[in-house]
Amino acid sequence: MVAKKRNTLRSKASARNSQNFGPDVANNGILDESYDIESDPRAFLHQPKETKKEKLLNRQNTFLSNLKGKSTLSDGIGANFDGISKSSIRRRKRKLREELKPRMQDLLTSLEQEKDLRGIIENSSKDMNNDDDIDMDSKIRFVDTKEMNLKKIEPGSVRIKKNQPNIRNQKGAKALAANETARFNQVLTNQDFQKNPFGALREVIKLQKH
């Protein structure tokens, strides 16, 4: 009995493949061909995403950049303060504030100018030959503040003293009560009040304006 060949089909298939593809066919009928596959960004199962920390950092950077842009647009000083310590920035700002404050030398020069102006006004008033038709608006009047604060007191008026005892204190209330009783007794014994009480009261109220 003759044994059958089991590799006849394989040998036929390999021979057929070698005829079709030539010498590039490897053993076992597998082709060795190189293919250029383009890289697909969605080839991976899990796409790369920004983490929460990265998102927070990006937001902070954008916020700071916007603030810097606004500060440089609002005033050009902010652009010069980049890379400078906070203490030096404070010193520079303090120096700018000191420059804006008024100086004594400027005050002295203004006072000298005021004196010169007063002399010019006096000379001009003398040169006008005592003409009374000059408008008051064209003159500069120097008024003392003490004179403005003092009120004119009409003659014959009774001035009320402001340094009276305090009614909120027990001692002051007693003093005021004693003064009032003495005054009441004095008014009752007054002849003018006995003749015409309302007229006397009216006259006293008129006098008590200050």
Curated annotation (Swiss-Prot):
Which Pfam families does this chain map to?
SLX9
Q: Which GO terms describe its biological process?
A: maturation of SSU-rRNA from tricistronic rRNA transcript (SSU-rRNA, 5.8S rRNA, LSU-rRNA)
**Region of interest: Disordered:** 1-33
Q: What is its main location?
A: nucleus
Q: Where is the composition biased (Polar residues)?
A: 10-21
Which of UniProt's keywords are assigned here?
Nucleus, Ribosome biogenesis, rRNA processing
Q: Name one GO cellular component term.
A: preribosome, small subunit precursor
Q: What induces it?
A: Transiently up-regulated during the initial 15 minutes of dough-fermentation.
Q: Which InterPro entries match?
A: Slx9-like (IPR028160)
The subcellular location is:
Nucleus, Nucleolus
Q: How does it assemble?
A: Interacts with the 35S, 23S and 20S pre-rRNAs and with the U3 snoRNA.
Which family does the entry's similarity section mention? Belongs to the SLX9 family.
What job does this protein perform? Involved in ribosome biogenesis. Required for normal pre-rRNA processing in internal transcribed spacer 1 (ITS1). May be involved in the movements of the replication forks.
User: What is the name listed in the Swiss-Prot or TrEMBL entry for this protein?
Assistant: Ribosome biogenesis protein SLX9
Q: Name the species this protein comes from.
A: Saccharomyces cerevisiae (strain YJM789)
